[in-house]
């Protein structure tokens, strides 16, 4: 089989930004790449699977589909995510839950799906994309920061669970990068007057830093 000696890699959030660049780089290095995202933006040499990472059944089905074809999964890179910004007191619980559903639980869903296969094969590499926001505690990005801190803490503990089975876990805490993430951020300046204009200034600074 042509793919027998090639690395089989899943990249989530591969339709844009860091995920798309990662998927392209892996393809160019000779890996067989499966890209999970809701949007199908075709990339030559990369297989798109329509997967919402918050849908555990869809994730499990996609992973099984890959195993049936390739018989293994060497690595997964969890890039799927988005950001919200605004004051905590003006952010709804539903908005906060949605942030965690994608950024944290989406990562958990994918990892849970691949772990049984990696454990059985005795090797694998899980790479979870976190952020400096996990440790920098950026105001008015509180729920985004919390979701990334959850990923980092989870990843350190997961590494201790699975390393006896030949599975490695890597956390990447990225800084500001110029991608479409800035335009996709769900921004809110509700309460800006109550906070002395600090919310709008903070959001503007975030956008400036990410574009430079």
Where do the language-model regions lie?
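The beta1-alpha1 cofactor-binding region of Rossmann-like NAD(H)/NADP(H)-dependent oxidoreductases
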Residues: 50-61, 93
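Substrate-binding pocket helix/loop in short-chain dehydrogenase/reductase
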Residues: 87-88, 95-97
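SDR active-site lid
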Residues: 164-212
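Residue(s) in the substrate-gating loop at a strand-loop-helix junction
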Residues: 131
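Conserved NAD(P)H cofactor-binding loop of Rossmann-fold oxidoreductase domains
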Residues: 79-84
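N-terminal Rossmann NAD(P)H-binding glycine-rich loop of SDR-like oxidoreductase domains
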Residues: 15, 23
């Amino acid at each position: 089989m042509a793919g027998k000696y090639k690395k089989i890699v899943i990249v989530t959030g591969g339709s844009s930004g860091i995920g798309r660049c990662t998927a392209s780089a892996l393809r160019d290095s000779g890996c067989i790449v499966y890209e999970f995202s809701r949007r199908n933006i075709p990339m030559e040499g990369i297989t798109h699977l329509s997967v919402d990472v918050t849908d555990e059944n869809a994730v499990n089905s996609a992973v099984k589909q890959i195993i049936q074809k390739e018989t293994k999964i060497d690595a997964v890179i969890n890039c799927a995510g988005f950001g919200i910004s605004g004051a905590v007191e003006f952010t709804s619980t539903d908005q906060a839950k949605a942030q965690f559903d994608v950024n944290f639980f989406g990562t958990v869903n994918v990892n849970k799906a691949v772990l049984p296969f990696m454990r059985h094969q005795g090797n694998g590499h899980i790479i979870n994309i976190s952020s400096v926001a996990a440790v920098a505690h950026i105001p008015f990005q509180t729920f985004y920061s919390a979701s990334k801190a959850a990923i980092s803490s989870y990843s350190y503990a997961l590494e201790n669970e699975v390393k006896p089975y030949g599975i490695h876990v890597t956390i990447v805490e990225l800084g500001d990068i110029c991608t479409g993430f800035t335009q996709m951020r769900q921004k809110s300046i509700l309460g800006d007057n109550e906070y002395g204009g600090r919310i709008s200034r903070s959001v503007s600074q975030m956008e400036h830093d990410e574009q430079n």
